[in-house]
From Swiss-Prot:
It catalyses: tRNA(Ser) + L-serine + ATP = L-seryl-tRNA(Ser) + AMP + diphosphate + H(+); tRNA(Sec) + L-serine + ATP = L-seryl-tRNA(Sec) + AMP + diphosphate + H(+). ATP binds at R262, S263, E264, E349, I350, S351, S352. This is Serine--tRNA ligase 2. It is an enzyme of class 6 (ligase). Keywords: Aminoacyl-tRNA synthetase, ATP-binding, Cytoplasm, Ligase, Nucleotide-binding, Protein biosynthesis. GO terms for cellular component: cytoplasm. It comes from Enterococcus faecalis (strain ATCC 700802 / V583). The lineage of its organism: Bacteria, Bacillati, Bacillota, Bacilli, Lactobacillales. Consists of two distinct domains, a catalytic core and a N-terminal extension that is involved in tRNA binding.
Length: 423
């Protein structure tokens, strides 16, 4: 959530930045009008309360002097009613302001490319050249079904479209991948491994910015305020909800494997086959808590942590700086890692690493006490390290052989019981 005082004092700059994120000018003008009305009403209320206090003292004096205070008492009843009415008006404006401020996205950092969508994303760097095949590479779902390691048909029978069974060496490959990812993050990158709740309340979903704006994107438990997590970012970030940390403990690194549940509202007709877009998938998440001074340094480190996984797996990828119109709601800056998918002859997102600055911390009240004993909002960061199913897809396509087998990436061989080929 944005700082209302900052919005008021820097309105033109805030308006210009939010418009690059698709926010309509009339919404921001309405915010300013409501904010001014609220401040005017607060001044009136304070003046009335001061007048009431002064007259109350006069009434007390009149009573001590055994003089008639009836008129002033009647006047104070009227003033009290006026104060109550103004308070109600202020509360109504507060609700309107909250309806606006809770749905405004974060301000983009000055380094973020300005643009309406993914077409304006900027490539930062690439790693490795895509493999040249001596045969036409098959899509991963075809490779997997021929090997009998993924079953989309029975997944659909049991749960509907966009669900899958991992089977045999397919399940082993998925498990090998997330164990490899967690080991790298914990033992080499310095993250603390967590196992989180997979169901969270509305407060947690609000804290990370999914609610109230994106309720249609998740699976909610009927007749409760509980939701299946769309990402482990939600329980990991909210671990410190409404807490004050010791600044000396920052930065704090968390990582967790969890299923992610997405309704994929608005994705009809997109990626209807394969592992790219499912309602349920495993993901290893990275979350950081930082001070303001070092959060962008931590973003670069987090992005490098995700890149190292792809490099060790030998998967070609590129890093994209997302434009203002393509970033997620809570992000101030985002890098996407896109892995090469041979059958589609294109790069597809496999990780997204974001600095949310103090946007989530304001919503979740995550603070720290600095060296001067002043309480500050923390900066929060999150990133995929990596989406496991999409990594399986990338391996099946990039490491497929002409005979239909799949070579196991060298770094995964120990995790696969020294198996070198899936066939």
């Amino acid at each position: 959530m944005l700082d209302v005082k900052m919005m008021r004092q820097n309105f033109d700059e805030v308006k210009a930045k939010l418009q690059t994120r698709g926010v309509k000018e009339e919404i921001l003008v309405e915010f300013l009008r409501l904010d001014e009305s609220r401040r005017d009403l607060l001044v009136k209320v304070e003046e009335m309360k001061k007048y009431r206090n002064d007259v109350s003292a006069e009434i007390a004096q009149l009573k001590r002097n055994k003089e008639d205070a009836t008129a002033k008492i009647a006047e104070m009843k009227e003033v009290g009613g006026n104060i109550k009415a103004l308070d109600a008006e202020i509360n109504a404006i507060d609700e309107e302001l909250r309806g606006i401020t809770t749905t405004l996205p974060n301000l983009p950092d000055d380094s973020v490319p300005v643009g309406a969508g993914e077409e304006e994303n900027v490539e930062v760097r690439r790693w490795s050249e895509p493999r040249t095949f001596a045969f036409e590479p098959k899509p991963h779902w075809e490779v997997a079904e021929n090997l009998g390691i993924l079953d989309f048909e029975r997944g659909a029978k049991v749960a509907g479209s966009r669900f899958v069974y991992y089977k045999g060496l397919g399940a082993r490959l998925e498990r090998a991948l997330y164990n490899f990812m967690l080991d790298l993050h914990v033992y080499e990158h310095g993250y603390t491994e967590m196992i989180t709740p997979y169901i969270v309340n509305d407060t947690a979903m609000f804290g990370t910015g999914q609610f109230p704006k994106f309720k249609e994107d998740v699976f909610q438990l009927q007749d409760t305020d509980l939701t299946l997590i769309p990402t482990a970012e939600v329980p990991l970030t909210n671990y410190y909800n409404n807490e004050i940390l010791d600044g000396k403990d920052l930065p704090i690194y968390f990582t967790a494997l969890s299923p992610s549940f997405r309704s994929e509202a608005g994705s009809a007709g997109r990626d209807t086959r394969g592992l790219i877009r499912l309602h349920q998938f495993n993901k290893v998440e990275m979350v950081k808590f930082s001070d303001a001074e070092h959060s962008y340094e931590e973003l670069e480190k987090m992005t490098n942590n995700a890149e190292e996984i792809l490099q060790k797996l030998g998967l070609p990828y590129r890093v994209m700086a997302l434009s203002t119109g393509d970033m997620g709601f809570s992000a101030a800056k985002t890098y996407d890692l896109e892995v090469w998918i041979p059958a589609q002859e294109t790069y597809r997102e496999i990780s997204s690493c974001s600095n949310c600055e103090d946007f989530q911390a304001r919503r979740a009240m995550i603070r720290y006490r600095d060296e001067n004993d002043k309480v500050q909002y923390a900066h929060t960061l999150n990133g995929s390290g990596l989406a496991v199913g999409r990594t399986v897809a990338a391996i099946l396509e990039n490491y497929q052989n002409e005979d239909g087998s799949v070579t196991v990436p060298e770094v995964l061989v120990p995790y696969m019981g020294n198996l070198t080929v899936i066939k």
